[in-house]
């Protein structure tokens, strides 16, 4: 069983559809799981905002999948953050990490500059494990490096589904994550241009997502705000949580995959090793007896 948090109690996602079937939308609050991830990774404020936006986007995209399917997002730019990697599944489990947790560029007004942290030049790669022989992979250039717009651009350009995404993370001066969440809206055939125009007007006029979340807006509240005047039905409410699938057994398999010669060299030169999971920062220590046991297992194959 991987590492997880009690954010399952407070973090959740709601999925709705317009009554005429032309628009689907999801909204979520992720304050607990984002706070836990940032604490584990020791992220500075701008890195926290970037990681929080990305894992929230991952949770929203994971909710579009079927049971057993997974999605991975990789943002890679030329900024000091280096990269963000997020994995999410259809059951509400999400995890993520950043290349440089201490990246902390600020704008001239003192606000967190996520785009500068990621860098203006780079790629967003989306990999979906749909249970087929090969995973589906799509790649687009970063659009604004603000994450929400990049995901909307990917969905619209690569998957050919007109989409709007809003993401927000509010980080307190002391580095604590006070609010995190977002929404994803997609236009479906038969497209209702009037309803889409109304939604885009609402999105254009709405305050920042972080402001609405700090006012106490729930996922239901975000959707009510966006869908004003558009009848819709709620399809699902699901819990979201930070869950890491790492385990000592998995790390053992990684060490075994090094092969007999490399594992023997590790045993002879160091006598022990420690492996840290990049997603949850859990440490796994393997002493001499552990390495000898793994080496004996390889020899017996």
Curated annotation (Swiss-Prot):
Q: Which organism is it from?
A: Geobacter metallireducens (strain ATCC 53774 / DSM 7210 / GS-15)
Q: What is this protein called?
A: 33 kDa chaperonin
Where it sits in the cell: the answer is: Cytoplasm
Q: Which NCBIfam families does the protein's record reference?
A: PRK00114.1 (NF001033)
- Specify one Pfam family: HSP33
Q: Which family does it belong to?
A: Belongs to the HSP33 family.
Name the Gene Ontology biological process terms: protein refolding
Q: List the disulfide bonds.
A: 244-246, 277-280
Q: Describe its function.
A: Redox regulated molecular chaperone. Protects both thermally unfolding and oxidatively damaged proteins from irreversible aggregation. Plays an important role in the bacterial defense system toward oxidative stress.
Does this entry carry the keyword Zinc?
yes
- Modification after translation: Under oxidizing conditions two disulfide bonds are formed involving the reactive cysteines. Under reducing conditions zinc is bound to the reactive cysteines and the protein is inactive.
Matching CDD domains, A to Z? Hsp33
List cellular component terms (GO). cytoplasm
Name the keywords, alphabetized: Chaperone, Cytoplasm, Disulfide bond, Redox-active center, Zinc
InterPro entries the UniProt entry points to: Heat_shock_Hsp33, Heat_shock_Hsp33_C, Heat_shock_Hsp33_N
Q: Cite a single GO MF annotation.
A: protein folding chaperone
């Amino acid at each position: 069983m991987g590492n997880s948090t009690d954010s399952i109690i407070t973090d959740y996602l709601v999925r709705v559809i317009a009554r005429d079937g032309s628009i689907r939308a999801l909204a979520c609050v992720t304050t607990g799981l984002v706070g836990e991830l940032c604490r584990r990774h020791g992220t500075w404020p701008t890195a926290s905002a970037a990681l929080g936006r990305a894992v929230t986007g991952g949770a929203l995209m994971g909710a579009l999948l079927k049971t057993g399917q997974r999605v991975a997002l990789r943002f890679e730019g030329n900024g000091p953050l280096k990269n963000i990697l997020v994995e999410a599944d259809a059951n509400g489990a999400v995890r993520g990490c950043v290349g440089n947790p201490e990246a902390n560029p600020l704008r001239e007004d003192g606000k967190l500059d996520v785009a500068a942290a990621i860098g203006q030049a780079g790629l967003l790669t989306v990999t979906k494990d749909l249970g087929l022989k090969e995973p589906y992979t799509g790649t687009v250039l970063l659009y604004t490096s603000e994450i929400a717009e990049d995901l909307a651009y990917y969905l619209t350009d690569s998957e050919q589904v007109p989409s709007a995404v809003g993401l927000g993370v509010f980080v307190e001066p002391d580095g604590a994550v006070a609010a995190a969440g977002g929404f994803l809206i997609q236009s479906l055939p038969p497209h209702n241009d009037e309803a889409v125009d109304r939604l885009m007007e609402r999105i254009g006029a709405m305050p920042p997502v972080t402001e609405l979340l700090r006012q106490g807006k729930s996922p239901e509240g975000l959707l009510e705000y966006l869908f004003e005047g558009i009848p819709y039905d709620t399809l699902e409410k699901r819990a979201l949580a930070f869950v890491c699938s790492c385990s000592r057994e998995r790390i053992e398999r990684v060490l075994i995959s090094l092969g007999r010669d490399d594992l023997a060299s590790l045993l002879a030169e160091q006598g022990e090793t420690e492996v840290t999971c990049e997603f949850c920062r859990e440490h796994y220590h393997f002493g001499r007896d552990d390495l000898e046991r793994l080496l004996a297992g390889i020899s017996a194959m």
